[in-house]
Amino acid sequence: MKPGSVAVVGAAESTELGKLPHISNTQLHADAALNAMADCGIGPGDIDGIATARENPIEIAHYLGIKPRYVDGTGVGGCSFMIHVRHAVAAIESGMANTILITHGESGRSQVGMTPRGVNM
């Protein structure tokens, strides 16, 4: 593959937005991922790499039916996904994968007002 021939081909958000206490982070990952795949006309069988932070990328791949050759779980805060893009480009250019899904799923608004974990009140 020639350098510079990597492209972002699909992008999407989850179908529902806002306060979503009835949907898990994994479900939000999956919903956004399926919407992104639909945006570019591919399915889980076309993806051979996955990258995400916070949630386990292997669990997300399994949930979506993806069998990855490449997995990136780099988590460094809010810029994790920009690092995933750079890692994905390097993985594709080196032949480690052909199509890499970068996903995120979280509804921080759903946790507003909730008691933090480990706090007894």
Locate predicted features.
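Conserved "HGTGT" condensation-loop signature of ketosynthase/thiolase-family condensing enzymes
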Residues: M1-V76, V89-S94, L101-M121
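Short phosphate-binding loop-to-helix
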Residues: G77-H87
